[in-house]
Every structure is written in C-alpha cells, then in structure tokens.
C-alpha cells in the first residue's frame, strides 16, 4: 500500500516500507 501524500517524498509512491521510497530510491521519515 502507498503512504498518504503527506508522507510521500518528492511525489513518489511508496511501497511496503514506511521509510523507503522504492520508485525513487530515497529514504525519508514521515
């Protein structure tokens, strides 16, 4: 599932991990 838009970094849709943006390869914290 994707995280809410408020948790998304640089407009990327994130995968299962809440700390990893799979599409862009950017780590971030909500």
UniProtKB/Swiss-Prot annotation:
Keywords assigned: Antibiotic, Antimicrobial, Disulfide bond, Secreted
Keyword Membrane applies: no
Subcellular location: Secreted
BP-aspect Gene Ontology terms: defense response to bacterium
Cystine pairs: 2-7, 12-24, 13-30, 14-21
Tree of life domain: Eukaryota
GO cellular component labels: extracellular region
Main location: secreted
Function (record text): Sillucin is an antimicrobial agent produced by the thermophilic fungus Rhizomucor pusillus in liquid culture; it is effective against Gram-positive bacteria at the level of RNA metabolism.
UniProt-recorded name of the protein: Sillucin
């Amino acid at each position: 599932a994707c995280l809410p838009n408020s948790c998304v970094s640089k407009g990327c849709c994130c995968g299962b991990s809440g700390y990893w943006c799979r599409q862009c390869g950017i780590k971030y914290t909500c």
